[in-house]
């Protein structure tokens, strides 16, 4: 795979790369660059998590070494449970990411507690605290914090640690949703002041919830890896998908970010009287037909549910989920 093809694959469906020139230089000069994503262990792995898992798979194909940080201490600071509860969920998350297709032989899974309690790391947290204003730390955390009003001091430490993870894990590329941008910019600006390199950052879009609103576990507006096929079909049928509307359309987003990258195409099956089957090899073609009214929302939903269940089938089997 040449440099141009690697760049195309790495940046496919990315919201932003900071910066593309630095990314090109990285893959031109380093044989096996390292990339990472950090995840707070979560009881439900859903299509939102799969956005970055898919990007890690793209990076593996492009020759990157992958580190998956299961951020147990971050989860504790963000009030996600006791250490014992978080450890159990972290083990489950590792199994899910592998079941979804991440190549275990080319990925290293690390618990934050394996290194974040070391003397050197804690000292770096204190150094980072000395050069970061309270307002900057709070702004960096606002997008990902569980407690928006009256935040705890622990939540101010969180972004400092996340920035330092990049240095202490020795990675070249930090990957995350666009909601991580402020933390990554903090890392780019302040890590060099502590003697570390500034990372390249790649941000994926935030997948809209099935109701067209922000995806949230409390709202239940997501599809979980553990959802059985009939539940996936039910959720897709009920999902927000207004005719002709392309922007913030969750069904089109699923096709764009999950189905087309995995299958390379999507075939919408229709009766001959409705135009017959139609195959789309690009999102642009799919979006154009949907916007013009040539593709009906129900036909799109049926196709998306079918492909999504195909995508999740292997993961369910590997996890031992009965369907």
UniProtKB/Swiss-Prot annotation:
Its EC number is 6.1.1.1. Keywords: Aminoacyl-tRNA synthetase, ATP-binding, Cytoplasm, Ligase, Nucleotide-binding, Protein biosynthesis. ATP binds at residue 217. It is found in: Cytoplasm. L-tyrosine binds at residues 36, 158, 162, 165, 180. It catalyses: tRNA(Tyr) + L-tyrosine + ATP = L-tyrosyl-tRNA(Tyr) + AMP + diphosphate + H(+). A motif ('HIGH' region) lies at residues 41-49. It comes from the Archaea. GO terms for cellular component: cytoplasm. GO terms for molecular function: ATP binding; tyrosine-tRNA ligase activity. Transmembrane segments: none annotated. A motif ('KMSKS' region) lies at residues 214-218. Homodimer. Catalyzes the attachment of tyrosine to tRNA(Tyr) in a two-step reaction: tyrosine is first activated by ATP to form Tyr-AMP and then transferred to the acceptor end of tRNA(Tyr). Belongs to the class-I aminoacyl-tRNA synthetase family. TyrS type 3 subfamily. NCBIfam families: PRK08560.1, tyrS. This is Tyrosine--tRNA ligase. It comes from Archaeoglobus fulgidus (strain ATCC 49558 / DSM 4304 / JCM 9628 / NBRC 100126 / VC-16).
